[in-house]
């Protein structure tokens, strides 16, 4: 479960960074 949460957090950070670059 811990690794699953870490994976979700990592994906959210990557998505946020990509979204910020697109703006």
From Swiss-Prot:
Keyword terms, alphabetized: Cell inner membrane, Cell membrane, Membrane, Stress response, Transmembrane, Transmembrane helix
Location (main, coarse): membrane
Transmembrane segments: 3-23
Record's bilayer topology term: Single-pass membrane protein
CC terms in the record's Gene Ontology section: membrane; plasma membrane
Entry's induction text: In exponential phase, strongly repressed by thiol oxidant diamide (at protein level).
Entry annotated with the keyword Kinase: no
Subcellular localization: Cell inner membrane
Name of the protein in its database record: Uncharacterized membrane protein YpdK
């Amino acid at each position: 479960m811990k690794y699953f949460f870490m994976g979700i957090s990592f994906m959210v950070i990557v998505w946020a960074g990509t979204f910020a670059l697109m703006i």
